[in-house]
Amino acid sequence: MRMNTVRVTLAIALLTAAAHQTARFNKTRVTFKSGNLTLVGYAYHPDGNGPFPTVIWNHGSEKNPGGGPQFDSVAAVFVPAGYAVFAPMRRGHSDSEGGYIVDTLNVARARGDGSDRTLLVKLHETQQLDDQLAGVAYAKTLPFVDARRLVVAGCSFGGIQTLLAAERARSVGFRAALPISPAALTWSRTPEIQERLKRSVHEITIPVLLIQPPGDASLEPARVLGAEAARIGKKQFRTMVYAPTMPDSQRVHCFGGAKGFHTWAKDAVQFFADALK
């Protein structure tokens, strides 16, 4: 009987802690339209009415980004610093309608003709970007979002999306971009995405801080895009590979996910604060 009481007490304590975290970040699940598809996103904001500067967070290629700690962990970085966060989930991910990009690419890859490489670029430039920008448009309607102080960030496929969105800063309203490990998993086998992201360096006019962990799948995105920025005199486009001072599990792609976000948290908050001055 005593053991059952302890278990019940522990369960209540855990539920209370989870409820406190959700309340602290004012987490809300929302839906929005991208064309004829209904997509899902998560919004967070500090206590109070705002409006707050807002981080648009782009997830990677994982099937269920809404089912893990990713978005809450992003909120834990930015909400205490005074930011709202909006994380749209692109088509086919989690509860969002539509086809899943990885399934589409796998079908093309199975043909063995290299068409998956050009398709990767095409889907990022069209469907994936359309979904992200639909999410941004929705976020701008939220009363706690300051549409004049928008920044964008994301990892892996989300890093690609961050760079593509940054190209449209003038029309969308982004003030800075933080791509993390953009295309690192596909870089070595996809020259098409290499060239497309080099083109982004030329197109982007807002501050960019591209970061990677020391053990990423490829460090070429930081090296190549940083060199291209230096070559054309884009001083606002900076890259940084972190020193291997973190645990091994956080030295890998996207800093190992949510558990490694603390590694770049301080740099990200400072970067955005400087860009929004």
Model-derived features: where do they sit?
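The feature captures the conserved acid-bearing segment of alpha/beta-hydrolase catalytic domains
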Residues: A176-R238
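Short substrate-entry loop that stabilizes the transition state in hydrolases
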Residues: G50-F52, G60-E97, T186-W187, S218-L219
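N-terminal cap/lid segment of alpha/beta-hydrolase-fold proteins
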Residues: H20-N49
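Alpha/beta-hydrolase active-site loop
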Residues: D103-P143
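Alpha/beta-hydrolase
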Residues: N58, P88-R90, I180, Y242
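Short glycine-enriched nucleophile-adjacent loop
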Residues: A139, G159-S171
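C-terminal catalytic histidine-bearing segment of alpha/beta-hydrolase fold enzymes
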Residues: K234-K277
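Alpha/beta-hydrolase fold nucleophile elbow
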Residues: F144-S156
